[in-house]
Structure formats: structure tokens, C-alpha cells
Amino acid sequence: MASLDNFDMAAGRTDGVADCVAFPGRFSTWTRALILAASAAGGGAAALAMDAAHVALVLGLAAFAGGLLSTWSPCGYSSISLLRPTGKGARAVLDWLPTFATHGLGYALGALILGTLLGAIGGIAGLSGFATSFGLGLLAVIGLAYGAHQLDFLRVPYPQRRAQVPHDARQRFPKWVVGGLYGLSLGLDYLTYVQTPLLYLVTAAAVLSGNVAEAVALIAIFNLGRYLPVAVNLLPVTDYQIQSWLGRNQERAAIADGAILTAVGAAFAMLALA
């Protein structure tokens, strides 16, 4: 649940992202505790109807949700704002479609690179899949720990490169080129600050798979969730309306993040112990 209070939009530099030290009070401690308990109970109950074959489906859904929730990161706000069509009307939207396309291609390339690296690491380490007892146990710990982190009951290390894409690129290249560069930078997922620990869950699953194809697929699903929100620029809404809506729902996004992590962690814990 990081704040954007210290988010610097100055062009011509890579922006730093400071840690959050204060949290909005929209959700009381009791409310967050109830969400934590309900999520854990829901995940545990769901595990009763699951087997190893369902693990990949759950991870895929969690990856997509994580990608969507990463919109509430500094780069999520920025990519929607900075890659907007120039002008108004149907013609402006048509002229913007190449930017939208190259942005998606950048995300796809990022998924291919990162997924290949993670899958190869798992393969070299001799890991044989995320549905093993060890794999499920590790994913359960990550989900439960970072779920409590997002719900502000636990402080867990959050190692990331606290930086943003360099804004001066839009001064030097056509917008469709910038779209591709931003997509690649964001699609590598660890070059910029991503405000959802679901990325760690997906990363761990990709390594645990020990399989390049499965790892690429997981990262691609996460990146698809990151990419699609930019499509809001196809709609007749202003940048102010979009940014205001994101700002109003910042805390809700963090709560949803924590609930998903907790539910997935509880489900995988039950499967690991079965």
C-alpha cells in the first residue's frame, strides 16, 4: 500500500519511488482483520475442491489479477497518462493504435525475456513444478506473508528497483516508439517499481516450474493484465477522470491485492498439507 506522495514527474531523469510510511485510514483495523480472516477461510475452503491440476489455473488467475492491480503503481499511472492519443475524436484514436500495438509488443517481449530467464533458473536448479509439496508450501508462505503485508498487519521486505521509466524518451522518439520502449521496460517487471507483491508469487511460480514455456506463460499473463488498462484511452474519457478514479481506488486496490494473496496462500497451504 505505497503512497504516491513522493512521486516526482520531472522529465529527463529516472524517478525514484520512496517507501510508504503512512497508510490511509479508509479501512479500519477490524475491517482489514475481517478481510484477512475471510480471505484465508475462503482460500482454505476452495482448496477442498482443488487438486494439483487446478494449481496452474489459480496461478494464472492470480497473475492476471496482479497485472491489473499493478496499474496502481507509479508507472501504471504514468503509462496511461503519457501514452494517451494526441487530440480528440476517432481520427486521434486511429492514429494512436500503432502506439497501443507497440506497447503490447513490448510487454510480450519482456515476458519472453523474463520468463525464459526464470524458467531456465528453475530448470538448472532441478525444480520440477509448482504443484509439488515444496512448491505449494513456498507459494503458500509468500501468499500469506505478503497478504498480511498488503493488509498492513506485517512488514515484509519488498526488494525492487525503486525507479520509473525515463520520461525524456517521449521528447526524443515518436510516440509509437515510446510505447514499445515503455512496454518492454514495464514488461520486464523488475526494472521499475511494481506495487503488487503478486509479482513475487508469479515469479516464484515461474522459477518453480523449471520449464521455460510455463514460466513465459505465467509472466505473459501477468503482463497482459498490466497492458490492458492502457486500452481505457480508447474511450472518450479525460486523463483527469482516469487519474482521479485510480486515486480514489488506490487503497481498495491494495486491499484486493492482500485478499487475493491471502486466499491463494491459504489454498496452497491446505494443498501442501494434504
From Swiss-Prot:
Keywords: Cell membrane, Membrane, Transmembrane, Transmembrane helix. Its main location: membrane. The chain crosses the membrane at residues 30-50, 52-72, 105-125, 127-147, 176-196, 202-222, 253-273. It is a multi-pass membrane protein. It is found in: Cell membrane. Pathway: One-carbon metabolism; methylamine degradation. GO terms for cellular component: plasma membrane. This is Methylamine utilization protein MauF. It comes from Paracoccus versutus (Thiobacillus versutus).
